[in-house]
């Protein structure tokens, strides 16, 4: 085992050694020795040495306040560096085959050959390939932009050091650079001092595009093209756009009062400015490259007859267009009222002249030049357009109903919110069909209502290409969808936007089918949507509401019934997945998660949210992003060309039982245990999390309520901090054991072998169990929970132990994650640093809760532990 990851371990050692030097220089020998003692005790405790575990606890209990911050920061940085080394390892030349999946696409092709899938079908599936990743801000992306840029540079150094023919002079220079970067990170703020604004979040998203995706997209398409050529004999069409991006940053106003219509307008301007800026870099590079003099007639005509270097002449025209666009957008961003529009409005303004150059170079025998940087730029133009990313708008359904309520009361026709669903639909369809405006000129709406209407006006003023979808959270009825169409129409929106209901609680998921059926029965609505409907499936709220097993089945069921409705109605359906990084929020390794969906659910392509810290792990470096695109592409092609089996009726029946039993078990604790909420508040840093300057949105929808008013993210985040990770497993193992006791062992084993949906669920549970740590959870209880609440923690841990046995028994496995040695190793590697952070966090919570006003020192150290554990647990919220 040890030899297996030798290259990775030697990088971890080297980075750790350099960090040690930095700590010694910054804080002296005493702190360095303290950190080393704790690290060694932790390593020995991990190996099962109980005496050293006790010593570790004592060591941390006796740390003076002023040493807590540097010690905590040391372990936080160790973890960040371990994560970098691990992320780098997956793309390094020393990477073991079973980790890198060197080639998801090629292994898919050999599967297709084995299953006699025709090349014609494959070519069609490739043409239909549509992956839309929706970048969302995330309070758990604790890593600041400054740090992320340093991480990218550290990666570059690791890559250099791997070259075997590096001279000793170059090696020294690179090692010195690494040491500087690690020192820079150490002396920067790990944690933001202020909450980020929605604009900061949007800029963070643009930085991901600039640092990674801008390179990754053409690289991915180039690789894909070569593979298709060798397998199918034809490559990707030049205008193919299998991967593109949308964003919620600056558009998601659900529960976030800071995202206003003016913020949305500014983000749209910034997004276009950034796109123009990135294209300008490309064009400048092409100007230096394309100095050729021979061209076809079309290029000569575009360049003007007397041009000696026609390609450069065309590119210089584009450069002027982009510079002018940037200047005008810049002035608008800085508040100048300009009547002129930025000249770059449509993708064709870039595509047509560049494509003309491309064709001319090919015609004149210079194809090898055309297929270089010019082709990359053309591919970017298709993927990123003039807006860089399309913006989604998200708002809660009740906010739209409030607008209509206030309006109908003003018009004297009653109170919209009190009407029956039938009356609402009649009113909305009537108004949608009507030519006269509905909003009276002299009406002065209240502030919240005006804000919703102003947002609709911003949408109406922008081109269709600027937006992805209008997502309605907590959508429950057909009128919720029609209401948004009406408000957009009233704002003068000249096109029909994709209005996408988000079904997120257990009941809403179960009703999704009937809502969409009802919409499809309205002729007017059918006319609007031009045979295309998008529906979003919420993962986090359903899991918080009913537990993971029950939520997982409800999501599967909802997808399956929506696919059927769409087929019956002859409508194209796009399912939009609101997954998070954690299992409690639907996270699973991408490839497995997609293959475990119902048959035909990926026909309309994939649209999925990528969140905060997962953006960094999956898309943060160009090579890593290319790997992620390959995994997504191969999974979608496989799901569409080799669909998973339809579940047998007896599997479904048993899933119904599992779902019911697990939901009861979960709610029995979360809602039924009178001590549960006080225990949760004492055993986790939930209350302290609210103070963290993490995301731009508040942690609670309603500041006074219990668990149900907590947002899904802090709910899950808090439990992953104390290592009980309760929401990701509670109820599931009990339901499995219940079914075994009822004599269904053989059927469960069959489901495990033959049904990807079920085996993925169990695989996700195994990963969660591996990340749970009962001893640490018990230590939090001893240090933080009052004695009369401690028995509840003991009961939960006993349940967890029983659940692990039940799941391993059904899978016929001896140990957790035995089929995923790399996953195991990766968790083990980080645990050495996570455990001390957990101990430190429990100590810090204990100390801050002892005083009315905790010192800034302790608060900062506490925030660093929260950030560090989040980095160590990888999928936090």
UniProtKB/Swiss-Prot annotation:
| InterPro entries per the UniProt record, alphabetical | PEP_COase, PEP_COase_bac/pln-type, PEP_COase_Lys_AS, PEPCASE_His_AS, Pyrv/PenolPyrv_kinase-like_dom
Instruction: List, alphabetically, the NCBIfam families matched.
Output: PRK00009.1
**Record's catalysed reaction(s):** oxaloacetate + phosphate = phosphoenolpyruvate + hydrogencarbonate
| Gene transcribed to yield this protein | ppc
In the Enzyme Commission scheme, what number(s) does this protein have? 4.1.1.31
Domain of life according to the entry: Bacteria
Cofactor (UniProt) = Mg(2+)
The EC category is lyase
Record GO cellular component, one term: cytosol
GO BP, one annotated term: tricarboxylic acid cycle
Task: Give a yes or no for keyword Lyase in this entry.
Answer: yes
- Give the protein's biological function: Forms oxaloacetate, a four-carbon dicarboxylic acid source for the tricarboxylic acid cycle.
Q: What protein family does this chain belong to?
A: Belongs to the PEPCase type 1 family.
Give the positions the UniProt entry annotates as the active site. 138, 544
What the entry lists under Pfam families is as follows: PEPcase (PF00311)
Q: In the record, what terms sit under GO molecular function? A: magnesium ion binding; phosphoenolpyruvate carboxylase activity
Question: Can you name this protein?
Answer: Phosphoenolpyruvate carboxylase
Q: Which UniProt keywords apply?
A: Carbon dioxide fixation, Lyase, Magnesium
């Amino acid at each position: 085992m040890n030899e297996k990851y030798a290259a990775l371990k030697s990088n971890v050692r080297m980075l750790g050694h350099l960090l040690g030097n930095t700590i010694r220089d910054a804080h002296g020998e005493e702190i360095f020795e303290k950190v080393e003692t704790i690290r060694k005790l932790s390593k020995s405790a991990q190996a099962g040495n109980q005496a050293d575990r006790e010593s570790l606890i004592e060591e941390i209990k006796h740390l003076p306040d002023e040493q807590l911050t540097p010690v905590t920061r040391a372990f936080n940085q160790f973890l960040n560096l371990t994560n970098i080394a691990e992320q780098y390892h997956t793309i390094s030349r020393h990477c073991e085959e079973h980790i890198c999946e060197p080639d998801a696409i090629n292994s898919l092709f050999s599967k297709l050959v084995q299953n006699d899938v025709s090349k014609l079908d494959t070519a069609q599936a490739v043409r239909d390939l549509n992956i839309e990743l929706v970048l969302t801000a995330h309070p758990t992306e604790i890593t600041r932009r400054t740090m992320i840029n340093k991480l990218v540079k550290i990666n570059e150094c690791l890559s250099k050091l791997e070259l075997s023919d590096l001279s000793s002079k170059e090696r020294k220079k690179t090692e010195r650079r690494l040491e500087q970067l690690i020192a820079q990170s150490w002396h920067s703020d790990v944690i933001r001092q202020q909450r980020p604004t929605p604009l900061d979040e949007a800029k963070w998203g643009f930085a991901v595009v600039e640092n990674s995706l801008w390179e990754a997209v053409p690289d991915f398409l180039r690789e894909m093209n070569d593979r298709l050529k060798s397998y199918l004999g034809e490559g990707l069409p030049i205008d193919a756009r299998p991967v593109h991006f949308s964003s919620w940053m600056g558009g998601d106003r659900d529960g976030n009062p800071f995202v206003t219509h003016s913020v949305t307008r500014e983000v749209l301007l910034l997004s276009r400015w950034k796109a123009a800026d990135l294209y300008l870099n490309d064009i400048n590079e092409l100007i230096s490259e394309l100095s050729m003099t021979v061209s076809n007639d079309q290029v000569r005509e575009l360049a003007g007859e007397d041009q000696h270097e026609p390609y450069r002449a065309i590119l210089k025209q584009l450069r002027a267009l982009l510079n002018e666009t940037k200047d005008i957008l810049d002035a608008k961003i800085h508040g100048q009222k300009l009547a002129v529009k930025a000249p770059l409005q449509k993708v064709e303004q870039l595509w047509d002249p560049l494509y003309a150059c491309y064709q001319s170079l090919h015609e004149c025998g210079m194809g090898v030049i055309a297929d270089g940087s010019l082709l990359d730029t053309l591919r970017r133009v298709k993927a990123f357009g003039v807006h860089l990313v399309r913006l989604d708008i998200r708002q809660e359904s009740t906010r739209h109903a409030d607008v209509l309520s206030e309006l109908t009361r003003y018009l004297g026709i009653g109170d919209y919110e009190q009407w029956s669903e039938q009356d609402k639909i009649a009113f909305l369809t009537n108004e949608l069909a009507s030519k006269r405006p509905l909003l009276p000129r002299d009406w002065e709406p209240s502030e919240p209502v005006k804000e919703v209407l102003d947002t609709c006006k911003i949408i109406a003023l922008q081109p269709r290409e600027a937006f992805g979808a209008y997502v309605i959270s907590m959508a429950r009825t057909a009128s919720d969808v029609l209401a948004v169409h009406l408000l957009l129409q009233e704002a003068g929106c000249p096109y029909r936007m994709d209005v996408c209901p988000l079904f997120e609680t257990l009941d809403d998921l179960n009703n999704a089918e009937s809502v969409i059926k009802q919409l499809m029965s309205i002729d007017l609505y059918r006319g609007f949507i031009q045979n295309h409907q998008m529906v979003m499936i919420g993962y986090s709220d359903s899991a918080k509401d009913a537990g993971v097993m029950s939520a997982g089945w409800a999501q599967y069921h909802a997808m399956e019934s929506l696919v059927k409705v769409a087929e019956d109605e002859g409508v194209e359906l796009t399912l939009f997945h609101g997954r998070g990084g954690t299992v409690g929020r639907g996270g699973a390794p991408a490839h497995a998660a997609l293959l475990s969906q119902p048959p035909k659910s990926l026909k309309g392509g994939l649209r999925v949210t990528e969140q905060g810290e997962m953006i960094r792990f999956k898309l943060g470096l160009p090579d890593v992003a290319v790997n992620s695109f390959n995994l997504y592409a191969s999974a979608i092609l496989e799901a569409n060309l080799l669909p998973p089996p339809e579940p047998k009726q007896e599997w479904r029946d048993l899933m119904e039982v599992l779902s019911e039993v697990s939901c009861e078990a979960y709610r029995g604790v979360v809602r039924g245990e009178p001590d549960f909420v006080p225990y949760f508040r004492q055993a986790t840093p939930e209350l302290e999390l609210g103070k963290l300057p993490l995301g731009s949105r508040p942690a609670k929808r309603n500041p006074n309520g219990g668990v149900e008013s907590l947002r899904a993210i802090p709910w899950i985040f808090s439990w992953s901090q104390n290592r009980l990770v309760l929401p990701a497993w509670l109820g599931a193992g009990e339901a499995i054991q219940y079914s075994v006791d009822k004599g269904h062992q053989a059927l469960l084993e069959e489901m495990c072998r033959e049904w990807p949906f079920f085996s993925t669920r169990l695989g996700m549970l195994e990963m969660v169990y591996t990340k749970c740590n009962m001893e640490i959870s018990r230590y939090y209880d001893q240090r933080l929970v009052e004695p009369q609440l401690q028995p509840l923690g003991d009961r939960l841990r006993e349940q967890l132990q029983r659940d692990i046995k039940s799941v391993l028994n059904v899978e016929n496995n001896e140990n957790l994650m035995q089929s995923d040695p790399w996953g195991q190793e990766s968790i083990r590697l980080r645990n050495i640093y996570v455990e001390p952070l957990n101990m430190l966090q429990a100590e810090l919570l204990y100390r801050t809760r002892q005083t009315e006003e905790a010192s800034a020192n302790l608060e900062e150290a506490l925030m660093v532990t929260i950030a560090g554990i989040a980095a160590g647990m990888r999928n936090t919220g």
